[in-house]
A protein has these predicted regions:
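Intrinsically disordered, low-complexity segments
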Residues: 5-8, 34
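A residue-level marker of the well-folded mature domains of exported/periplasmic proteins
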Residues: 21-337
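Bacterial N-terminal signal peptides
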Residues: 8-20
Length: 337
């Protein structure tokens, strides 16, 4: 059963219930001691497992989680694979935390199918699980809550921004991320559904996976540019490493600012590119809120309190016109505001 964002179109599968990276100075796997003890004197031990530990997005998730842990009296054990393509390592990490008998687990599954088994195992063992960032193909009682961006809507917003910049006409490319990633799959599907509403826009490539690193995305973008050349009027990249890779490829070809380029997620390089006119728009999540609400939800689940099945953390669009607004600056620089 596929766990979908709430605005996804009807599908012939059961919609579950209501139904997108380096941590700060901490190394992957380092425990964070936060907050005061609980009423019985026990400090909750919460495992938080991101998809990876090399992208800025996850640092912001971690930052928000620490804020909630400080308030709720919990220790966060933050650990994830170095690469977001390393499914086996994420499986090993969650299994280790299950064996360790932590009080609760927050998981961003990098594979919607493969991570279902250990999540079910954790539940059978009395360890509640909150899924964040990316959905899981599992029964509705396998986890306590899903904390995420409405990624389908984010893809739609990217398409609307692209169409506005193109004046409703042109040939565009969408670079996919990595097979098995539910969050980016939703962005991709949302983009394709929304862009189809513009008859003057032709999607000339949407089946290429750019991979989980900036380097792999740059290589794939170069291949697409080699194939289509001047035919490309616009490009949509569905996450931070892909967007940074596309940006580098466009800069190498002296095409930055000439091709309409919409990205998803943020980094310092992307924010600078938006200011300079090298990017047209950036679709932003609120990773700090995602981390914060994930810890809130897992603590409620541990305590046996009711938890909402889905917690929407919001989705926004940054442009040259609004980049200096308080809201966008907070999303671009969460640890500085």
């Amino acid at each position: 059963m596929r766990y979908l964002a709430p605005s996804s179109p009807p599908v012939l599968i059961l919609l579950i219930a209501l139904i997108g990276c380096q941590p700060p100075a901490d190394r992957a796997g380092q425990a964070d001691r936060s907050g005061s003890a609980t009423d019985d004197g026990k400090r909750l031990q919460i495992a938080m497992i991101p998809k990876g530990t090399t992208h800025i997005f996850w640092r912001s998730v971690h930052f928000g989680a620490l804020q909630a842990a400080e308030e709720l009296g919990a220790d966060i054990q933050w650990r994830g694979p170095q690469k977001e393509s390393d499914r086996d390592e994420q499986l090993n990490v969650i299994q280790g935390f299950i064996n360790k008998r932590v009080d609760g687990i927050c998981l961003a599954p990098l594979d919607a199918d493969a991570l279902a088994r250990p999540v079910k195992e954790a539940g059978r063992g009395g360890i509640p699980v909150v899924i964040f960032d990316s959905g899981l193909n599992a029964e509705p009682d396998s986890f306590a809550s899903y904390v995420a961006t409405d990624n389908y809507r984010g893809g739609q917003l990217a398409a609307e921004s692209m169409a506005a910049e193109l004046g409703g006409e042109g040939d565009v490319v969408m670079l996919r991320y990595n097979q098995g990633s539910e969050s980016t799959h939703q962005r991709e599907e949302g983009f394709l559904e929304a862009i189809a509403a513009y008859p003057g826009i032709n999607v000339i490539s949407s089946d290429q996976y750019a991979g989980t690193t900036t380097e792999s995305a740059m290589d794939k973008a170069q291949q697409v540019l080699n194939r289509y050349g001047d035919q490309i009027d616009g490009i949509f990249a569905v996450c931070e490493p892909n967007a940074e890779g596309v940006l580098r490829a466009l800069e190498d070809r002296k095409l930055a600012g000439k091709v309409v380029f919409v990205g998803f997620d943020s980094s310092d390089a992307m924010a600078e590119a938006l200011r300079a006119g090298k990017m047209s728009a950036i679709v932003l999540q609120d990773p700090v809120q995602m981390g914060y609400l994930s810890i809130q939800a897992i603590v409620k689940a541990i305590r046996g309190e009711p938890v909402d099945a889905f917690l929407d953390t919001g989705v926004y669009v940054a442009t040259q016109e609004n980049i200096d607004s308080d809201q966008i600056q907070k999303l671009l620089n969460p640890e500085k505001t």
